[in-house]
Amino acid sequence: MSISFNLLHREINTRARLGKLKTPHGDIDTPIFMPVGTQATVKSMTPDELENIKAQIILSNTYHLYLRPGSSLIDEAGGLHNFMNWQKPILTDSGGFQVFSLSDLREIKEEGVYFRSHLDGSRHFISPEKAIQIQMELGADIIMAFDECPPYPSDYDYVARSLERTVRWARRCKKAHEREDQALFGIIQGGVYRDLRKQSVEALIDIGFPGYAIGGLSVGEEKEKMLEVLDFTVPLMPENKPRYLMGVGAPEDLVEGVIRGVDMFDCVLPTRIARHGTVFTSQGRLTVRNAGYERDFTPLDPECDCYVCKNYTRAYIRHLIKRKEILGVRLTTYHNLYFLLSLMEKIRGAIKEDALLEFRDEFLRKYLNKASI
């Protein structure tokens, strides 16, 4: 099987939906947040811990795994699931975003992208066909088309030309994809331009994919601009296919994205800020390494029931982070991922009760106020 997507409920006051995404490695309740495991590991977390916090699917990075240890080695190991001992669903990105982030080290051609490795300067080439080959060897349940990712801001003409190439590449990706146990998603581009987003959606629907992602957001544009693009893009997307907003993971953005009809999200934010001693709480972000928490013997978030908040204090975690102890990063990462996955569970509950706007208002009132931190 590849995947199937069933819509279970549409919220009456918003565009939010409840869905069930079926994959060869299990079912996913949407809307969902996907922890990022760039190097075939969610940094500092074991697969058992990810299951404990109810992670349903994780994301890995094609670019990094292509460079190290190599997709052929992972294929030899039986694919990503066996290699990393994670038997639930996996999504791999195409590597496009990372390659196009190497602005001084890459050259774009119609056939693909030539680039130099950020590790050792070695020269490489990735085409749409190569990106699909790598992802077929990695063996994820959901894989992504290879797209061109314009920087923000970019002028209209550049984005228009880039979009046309992305559509041509999407066709090549679909033609190259041969694994029936994988689903290939197309990626909508078009920058902040309404007509280009519309053009992108229509072209990808014409090619035909089992799911569609919104790319090119959360790349430096203002929050209001991102929401505006979602407002005019999501309604154009097929109702009966999963909708994936790439690279978005701040709690407030997850809520707003779901309200606009998005089903899937991923972001390195929760794990990245955790490594620097910042955590999500019901009252907003908290930087536990700050001196004010040296003698604070309360949990990171008194309203959280995760393992970390039940067993450790801000003072202790601050001590670990300041001393650069590995356990400190493990605890902050565990808490942050639990916080987001728990938030998504609450969002799904609110959609079921047709009460998402009330949930949003109450959540943001506390989260953005930060009065008690």
UniProtKB/Swiss-Prot annotation:
Gene Ontology terms describing biological process:
queuosine biosynthetic process; tRNA wobble guanine modification; tRNA-guanine transglycosylation
**So where does Zn(2+) get bound?**
C304, C306, C309, H335
Query: For this UniProt entry, what's an example GO CC term?
Result: cytosol
- Residue positions binding substrate: D93, S94, G95, G96, F97, D147, Q189, G216
Top-level class of the enzyme under EC nomenclature: transferase
An example of a GO molecular function for this protein is: tRNA-guanosine(34) queuine transglycosylase activity
Q: How is the cofactor bound?
A: Binds 1 zinc ion per subunit.
Pfam families given in the database record? TGT
Homology family: Belongs to the queuine tRNA-ribosyltransferase family.
Q: Which HAMAP family match?
A: Q_tRNA_Tgt (MF_00168)
What is annotated about its quaternary structure and interactions? Homodimer. Within each dimer, one monomer is responsible for RNA recognition and catalysis, while the other monomer binds to the replacement base PreQ1.
What name does the UniProt record give this protein? Queuine tRNA-ribosyltransferase
What gene makes this protein? tgt
